């Protein structure tokens, strides 16, 4: 992932068409928690020790939790330390804003992210991956149609967390509340792209 501040610092906007994908926030945090937890599997040991100490510590903590319990996530949110905010707190807003790693995402960061979202020329939605790729493909003027797109970074493992469950959604709410607003705006831009390219 490349954050928007990193993009602005290192790339000339005039030389690039910017595309970004967004994911339903509950699905995103569920996947991310599973990914970090998976680092504690014995076969992942070498990969785990390549990560910073903060990631290793939280992976170990997650390995001891009951992912299926809403009480787990209530406590997880309450006990999250500033050094861990950058791993789990409203990550999609975080990617588009200037939020510091040890800083909670707030309303100012959300407004900054929404403003930057408007500068992104092509918005993809993970839940509509193939259609998103087709729209991006069409917008870029490529000759050949997109026949098959492969998502190579999809988790195939689960430890029992289900954030389609309302109790779990409420428990994890503080970690996705700003992302939910951003995601709704991303969906709107995606729908606008649908309309635009259906006319072209």
Where are these regions (language model features)?
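PAPS-dependent sulfotransferase catalytic domain
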Residues: 1-21, 27-148
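A residue-level signal for conserved active-site and pocket-lining positions in enzyme catalytic cores
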Residues: 24, 136, 179, 183
């Amino acid at each position: 992932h490349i954050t928007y501040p990193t993009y602005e610092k290192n790339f000339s906007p005039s030389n690039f068409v910017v595309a970004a994908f967004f994911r339903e926030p509950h699905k995103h945090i569920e996947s991310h928690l599973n990914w970090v937890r998976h680092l504690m599997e014995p076969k992942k040991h070498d990969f785990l020790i390549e990560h910073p100490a903060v990631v290793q510590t939280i992976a170990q903590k997650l390995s001891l939790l009951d992912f299926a319990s809403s009480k787990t996530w209530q406590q997880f949110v309450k006990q999250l330390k500033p050094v861990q905010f950058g791993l789990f707190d409203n990550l999609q807003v975080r990617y588009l804003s200037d939020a510091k790693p040890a800083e909670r995402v707030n309303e100012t960061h959300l407004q900054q992210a929404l403003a930057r979202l408007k500068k992104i020329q092509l918005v993809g939605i993970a839940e509509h991956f193939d259609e998103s790729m087709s729209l991006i493909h069409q917008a870029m003027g490529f000759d050949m149609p997109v026949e098959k797109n492969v998502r190579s970074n999809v988790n195939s493992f689960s430890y029992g967390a289900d954030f389609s469950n309302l109790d779990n959604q409420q428990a994890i709410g503080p970690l996705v509340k700003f992302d939910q607003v951003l995601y709704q705006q991303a969906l709107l831009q995606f729908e606008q792209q649908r309309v635009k390219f259906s006319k072209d």
